[in-house]
Structures are given as C-alpha cells and as structure tokens.
Amino acid sequence: QKPSFSLPIMRGLQVTGVLGVTLSVAHSSMMTGMPLRIRQLQRIPRSHCIRSCAVSATQSPPKKRKQKGSQGGGRGGGGSGGGKGITSREADYSQWYQDVIAAGDLTDQSPVKGCAVIKPTGMALWDSLRNELDQRIRKSGAQNAYFPLFIPVSFLSKEAEHVDGFAKECAVVTHHRLRALEEGKGVEPDPHARLEEPLIVRPTSETMIWYMFSKWIMSYRDLPLKINQWANVVRWELRTRPFLRTTEFLWQEGHTAHATSDEARQCAEQMLDVYASVCKDVLAMPVVKGLKSPTERFAGADDTYTIEALMQNGWALQSGTSHFLGQNFAKAFGVNFQNANNEQELVWATSWGVSTRLVGALVMSHSDDVGLVLPPAVAPNQVVLVPISQGPGKAPEQHEELMTFVQKAVVAMERSNVRIHVDTRFSMRPGNKYFEWERKGVPIRMEVGARDMAAGTLLCARRTGGEKFPLALDDSFGAKVVAELEAIQQALYDTAEARLHACTFEVESYAEMKDALEGSDSGGASGFFLVPWFDDAEAEAQIKTETKATIRCFPLDKQHLTEGRTCFYSGRPATHIALFARAF
C-alpha cells in the first residue's frame, strides 16, 4: 500500500516504526530528537516497514468524475490504485525497484553486461540533479575541467592502497587498433598494435589528476586548487542493478589541493554538507552524515566521510562520499609547493563525488506500487496538463477555445518557472494518459475540459494522493501552483524523515540486533541500528558474515555518546557510536 496524506502535513500524525513502536506527534518538525531506544525488539512483517515507515493523515476518499471508456482511474484521485506490471514492495522489493525503473522509462538494457542505456527521462533526472549540484560546487570555489578517460597502468601503482582498492575492478586497454579477419569473418586485435604500456579505463581520476597537479602547483600562491569534473567511469561489476551498481556510470568527482591539513579537512567536510543539502533540498531525502570505519574507507584516504540514506525496506544506501586524502597522493606524485618562507612542503588533498546512484536513491525513497514518485525540485516535468478534447478534427471551434485557455495556463506557469508539459495526444483516452503520468511520477496532473473552462478552473491531482481540487486561472494562478509544488516537496521530505526516525534504533547488545535482522530474513523489517562500538576489524567482518550488516558510518553527531559505554559486541570500552545496517 502506498502512504497517503493531505498536504501540508498537520498535527495529529502517527509514525509506526519497523519494530512496532508507534509515536503520536503534534507536528512532523518535532521528530528531530534522539532515535528510539529499544530494549526488546519484536519480529514483525516486512510489509509493515514499507507501509508504516511513512506519515499518514486521515482523509475522505477522493470524489471521482467518471470519464467514459477511461482506464487507470479515469479522472479519479492521483496516486491511487496499483500499477499494472509492477510487483508490490511487500512481495519483492528488489523486483519492485526494477519494475518502477521500467515503468518510468528511465533505462534500458544494452548488449554490454552492466552498461545500461539511460533513456531521456532518466537522463533528465540526472541533468536536473547535476545542474543544481554544479551551482553549489562552483560556489565552493571549484572549477570544472575534464581529464582523459585512459590512465597509464603505471599511474595506478604509484599509490599502494589505491591500486589494491581498484585492481579487481579495472578494465584494461592493450591494443590501439583492430584488423579484419580473412573472408569477412570479423575482426580481432592487431598483434602489431599492442600498446607499450597498457591503459586503464578510469575507475576514478585521482592518479591522472595528481599527475597534472604536479605540473600546476609550484607555490603557495597556486593554492588552494579546486577542480571538478563531470564524467563517466568504469568499474567492472559482476552483479549489477540500474543506477545503484553498474559497470559504467556517470558521476561528478572533485579534487582539491591545500597548504594545510586543517584547510583540506574543512573542504572535505564542506563538500559533505553540500551533498547532504542537495539530498534534502532537491531529492527530499534525509541522510545521516558520518565517518566510514577503517575497513570501509576509500582506498588511499586517511578518512572517508559519507552520507547514508534509509530506503523504504529499511536498508541503507551510500549516497555520496568525501575523502580527506592527507598527503598520500602528494607523496606518490611528488606534489610540493614553496611556502611563504621559501620552504618546500607537500600539499594536502581531498576528493569527493556523487553519481547516478542518487537517481536510484530517489526512486527507492519515494516511489510506490503504482510507479515513480518524483519530488518537484528534480522532476523534469513538474506539471502535466491534459486537455480533454477530441482534437481539432471534431468540434474545431470548441477545441480552439479550449487550447487558448490551456495556453493561458501554460504562460502563467512558465512565468513562475514551473516546468510543464501539455499532453496533446488527443487520439489517446484521457484515463490512459492519467495512468501513464502517474507511473512516471509527475508531481501534479492538471485536467481541463469544457466544464472546467466554463468555471475558469483547472482540475488538479497530486501524485502523492489526496482529493483532487480545482485551481482558478486568475492572476495568482502561477503562485498557487508553485505553493502546491513546494508543499509536495516538503511533504515528501517529512515522510522520509519520519521513516528515518521511526526506523533508527539504539541497541546495547549484539543479540538484540541479530535477532531483529534474523526476523527480517523471514519476512520482518530492517533498519538503522546505533550501537556502542570498539574498533575491531575482525569483529566487524564476523558481524557482516553472520548478519550481512555492515558499519555504514560513525555518525558525526553521535560520537560524544561513548563515555562510560561498552561495545555491544565485545564488551570493551566503546571508541565510537556505530551505525549498522544492511545495504545496497
């Protein structure tokens, strides 16, 4: 079942967590305190997690205006009913995700395993996200550049930890041309065209960029140097899933060099905040900011900062990382600078990036069993307008009058910077159009027929549900549409934030967490588990083997809570508060 609510979310909300704990709150903004502290964990169905880790408010059923021959609910309320061909989240969450991607027309399979085709709608989502993020990256002082796709294999071996981290994922180029076989039987690598040094198809660009930094940085006057690039990378994956894990993916990677350690670390933390703000403001997705454990940090980094998001099934999704690289790459590539005292010093470094994985996070955070649900801030089309007409061939005068009315509405919305699409497929039944746009997640659907035009209104349906409502085409029409979009954006964030709080648990013993996760294996729910932890790589590996849960991070705002507490696994004095979860 999809969560439904009236906008905006008001007093009297109830949030039920995956462990069966129900909170009644006066307002969603109150749900910003400490996570629930659970002593006895209950086994409950996974379906409860998907349904109840959301905010709901009592509402009357929508009034429907029937459309003869329509499908997908006719002119009924938005976001209602089940999606044909979409597996429910309760039945199979993984298949549901695949089905929603297909129904939303986001990707298609290519003949190359692990390399998906991102279709126009999927690319439009990435473009919206990229444009917003690029503005914030530029404001941080970074400049865009582009570096080669191919990296000499010797570069990768300059930083020992880095090569260990990526060696098994690298695609290698060994020849620079092909030759035709006899009798037209195809082509093969030309044995006379073997490269003197093999090239790596970039899995990430630290080595190439630091080689270039060694040429560009000479003096303290050259610092800080902040470079960003938008590119594709290749990491050979055996198990792939659209957007979440693919062999080739699109991303943004930033690389900076600084005169001091403090300045570099401050930059890494600043970019983590940028990523978290984009997730909140654009994707309507709350995240937990933290440090990775030593076993999970980026290869070649001193510290890795991460943002972790909670998906509807209680699993975590790493949504962005920012790395404090220390002087490791500066040493490997000899990047020195002359300071103000004419002394030579090594620079300090960071790197940071997010990828098209954020599109997958968006889909998993908000979508339902009908299809996509898109936050207005990132939706390629924020409004779809469906004129109810038989087309210009029948009753041309009435059609022309209707389309003039539609154009006035379009102009009013465009003046308010609303992204709008008018569906003029008049040979298609309106109900089929409604169903299609629901599956594609457009935040607001507007319908206008003769009755609406006579009343000077457009009939609106929110993708997130609730009663349909008329909106008068007057001087404030554009502003009212913007207000509705803002309310939808906020409601989606409030729902996701409520889920995060309701599905985050503090436990004091390993048995509690293990029992809860074992319950999820037989149909129960998962979640985030905050635990006191003593750093121990072997214990971390053992827990992963037994439960499939890993340390997602050490939350930055919880590390002061270790005093006087013992590790939930070993009983030794706690060194951190760790967040464990199963993860995509």
Label every model-predicted segment.
Residues I44-F584:
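NTP/phosphate- and nucleic-acid-binding module
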